[in-house]
C-alpha cells in the first residue's frame, strides 16, 4: 500500500467534510468522467459499452452505463481489468497458491475474493495506489477517548487467505500504521475457548469482527471465559441488529462502531454512536439506492473499474436537517444475515461455525453451495459445480470440499460431527426473497 497516497487521500477526505452535498456530487462527477476517459482506452469491456451506447466520456453520467452484475464480472474479468496482461486464470492460480493476505499478485496488485450473496467466487483487484485510496477511510475511525499509546487491535475472522476483512486489518501491521497499532489476528475456525484464552492474553484495546462473532464474544465475557476491556468494538461483515448492538455495548461497557465494507469497494459506510444512523462514505463512491438493491460506482479503482455494480444490500435514506457529515445518511444496512450454525463438539460443548467463513472457501470448480442442517452433530453440504468440467475435475473438487470441511471441523474440535457431500444441479431458493440461503434449517432437530 502506498503510504503517500494513503495520507494524500485522507487529507482530501478531511477537506471534503467542509463541502456541501451538492459540491461532493459535482466533484464525484468530475472524478467519474476522468475514470471513464481512462478506461475507454484500456478496458475492452467498457470500450464496447461506450461505443454501443454512444457515451461521451467528458459529458457522461453514471446512468448512461448499464447495471453491472457479479456474473458480468466473473464472465468478463479478462476484458474488464485495465491491465490486459492479467487473466482470471492467473489470479485463480495465485489465490490457490498464496494464503498470506498481504501477498501481492506480481508484487503489484492486492487480490481479494469472496462469494457473497450469489455463492459464486468473484475476484477483485487493486493496485497499491487503488488500495491506499480505498483504505483512507479507515484512518481516524477510532476517535474515542483512548489513552495515548500503541493500540492493540484484535481481529476475529477468517485469517488465512485473501479475504477483505483480514487484508484490510493486516495493513496495520505494515509501514506507518504499525507505529500506531499492534495488531493480532484470531482465526475464527479455532475452538471458542482457544480464542478466548489468546484474546485474554493479548488484552486488546480494539476488537474487530463479524457481528455474530462479536456477540458470541460478549456472551463469553458474561460467562467469564473471556475477560477483556476494549475501548472500542468494531462490527463488520454482517448487519447488526439494535438489540445485539445494545447487548455488545453494555457487556463490554464501550462504544461500538458499525462499519459497512465489502470486497468490491472496501470502506462504504460508518455508524458511530454520535451519528445515530449510518453515513455512506461518498468521497469516492457513487450510490444509487433502490427499494430492493443498491448500485455502486467505484471512483478510486483504476485497475478493476466497477460502474453501477449491483449489490443486494438495501439502504434506506434517513432525512436529516443538521448533518454531521455531508453524505447520505441511511438506516443500518439491511442485507444478508445468515444463520450461525451451532454444533456439539467432541467434548460435549456447543461451539459455532459462521456460514460466512465457509462462504470464503476457495474451491476452483465450486460454483455455489448450500448447507442442510440435520441436527447438532450432522449436516449435508450441497455442492453446485461448474458446468462442463471433466469427471476428474469433479472428483477433485469434491475431494477438496471434503478436505476443507474436515480441516474446519478438526480445528473446531468437531471431528465427531458427520456430514455428507451431495452434488446438486440446483439449490433451494427462499420463496419470500427470491434469494438462496447458505444455510437451510428445515426439519431441524433442536438446532440452536
Predicted feature residues:
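Nucleotide 5′-phosphate-binding alpha/beta core
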Residues: 1-113, 120-135, 139-151, 201, ...
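Short, hinge-like loop/turn segments at secondary-structure boundaries
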Residues: 172, 224-227, 274-278
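Conserved AMP-binding/adenylate-forming
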Residues: 240-322
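Short, structured coil segments at secondary-structure junctions
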Residues: 179, 229, 251-255
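AMP-binding/adenylate-forming
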Residues: 129-132, 152-213
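AMP-binding/adenylate-forming catalytic core of the ANL superfamily
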Residues: 207, 309-413
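Residue-level signal for inorganic ion chemistry
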Residues: 39, 114, 153, 207, ...
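Adenylate-forming
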Residues: 187-194, 204-245, 258-264
Amino acid at each position: 500500500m502506498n503510504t503517500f497516497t494513503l495520507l494524500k487521500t485522507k487529507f482530501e477526505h478531511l477537506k471534503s467534510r467542509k463541502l456541501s452535498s451538492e459540491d461532493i456530487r459535482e466533484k464525484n462527477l468530475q472524478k467519474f468522467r476522468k475514470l471513464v476517459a481512462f478506461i475507454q482506452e484500456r478496458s475492452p469491456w467498457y470500450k464496447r459499452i461506450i461505443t454501443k451506447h454512444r457515451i461521451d466520456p467528458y459529458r457522461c453520467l453514471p446512468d448512461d452505463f448499464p447495471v453491472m452484475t457479479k456474473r458480468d464480472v466473473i464472465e468478463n474479468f479478462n476484458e474488464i481489468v485495465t491491465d490486459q496482461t492479467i487473466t482470471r486464470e492467473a489470479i485463480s492460480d495465485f489465490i490457490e497458491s498464496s494464503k498470506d493476505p498481504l501477498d501481492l499478485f506480481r508484487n503489484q496488485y492486492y487480490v481479494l475474493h469472496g462469494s457473497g450473496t450469489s455463492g459464486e467466487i468473484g475476484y477483485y483487484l487493486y493496485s497499491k495506489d487503488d488500495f491506499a485510496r480505498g483504505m483512507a477511510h479507515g484512518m481516524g475511525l477510532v476517535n474515542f477517548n483512548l489513552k495515548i499509546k500503541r493500540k492493540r487491535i484484535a481481529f476475529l475472522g477468517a485469517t488465512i487467505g485473501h479475504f477483505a476483512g483480514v487484508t484490510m486489518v493486516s495493513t496495520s501491521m505494515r509501514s506507518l500504521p504499525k507505529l500506531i497499532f499492534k495488531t493480532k489476528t484470531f482465526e475464527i475456525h479455532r475452538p471458542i475457548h482457544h480464542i478466548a484464552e489468546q484474546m485474554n492474553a493479548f488484552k486488546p484495546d480494539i476488537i474487530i469482527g463479524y457481528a455474530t462473532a462479536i456477540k458470541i464474544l460478549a456472551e463469553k465475557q458474561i460467562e467469564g471465559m473471556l475477560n477483556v476491556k476494549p475501548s472500542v468494538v468494531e462490527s463488520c461483515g454482517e448487519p447488526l441488529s439494535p438489540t445485539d448492538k445494545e447487548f455488545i455495548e453494555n457487556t463490554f461497557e464501550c462504544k461500538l462502531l458499525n462499519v459497512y465494507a465489502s470486497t468490491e469497494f472496501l470502506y462504504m459506510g460508518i455508524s458511530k454512536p454520535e451519528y445515530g444512523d449510518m453515513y455512506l462514505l461518498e468521497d469516492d463512491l457513487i450510490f444509487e439506492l433502490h427499494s430492493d438493491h443498491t448500485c455502486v460506482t467505484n471512483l478510486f479503482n483504476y485497475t478493476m473499474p466497477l460502474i453501477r455494480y449491483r449489490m443486494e444490500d438495501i439502504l434506506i435514506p434517513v432525512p436529516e436537517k443538521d448533518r454531521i457529515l455531508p453524505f447520505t445518511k441511511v438506516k443500518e444496512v439491511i442485507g444478508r444475515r445468515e444463520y450461525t450454525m451451532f454444533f456439539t463438539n467432541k467434548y460435549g460443548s456447543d461451539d459455532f461455525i459462521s456460514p460466512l467463513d465457509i462462504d470464503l472457501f476457495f474451491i476452483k470448480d465450486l460454483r455455489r453451495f448450500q448447507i442442510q442442517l440435520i441436527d447438532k452433530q450432522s449436516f449435508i453440504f450441497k455442492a453446485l459445480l461448474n458446468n462442463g468440467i471433466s469427471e476428474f475435475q469433479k472428483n477433485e473438487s469434491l475431494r477438496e470440499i471434503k478436505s476443507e470441511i474436515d480441516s474446519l471441523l478438526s480445528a473446531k474440535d468437531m471431528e465427531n460431527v458427520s456430514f455428507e457431500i451431495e452434488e446438486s444441479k440446483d439449490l433451494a431458493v427462499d420463496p419470500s426473497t427470491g434469494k438462496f440461503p447458505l444455510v437451510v434449517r428445515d426439519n431441524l432437530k433442536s438446532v440452536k
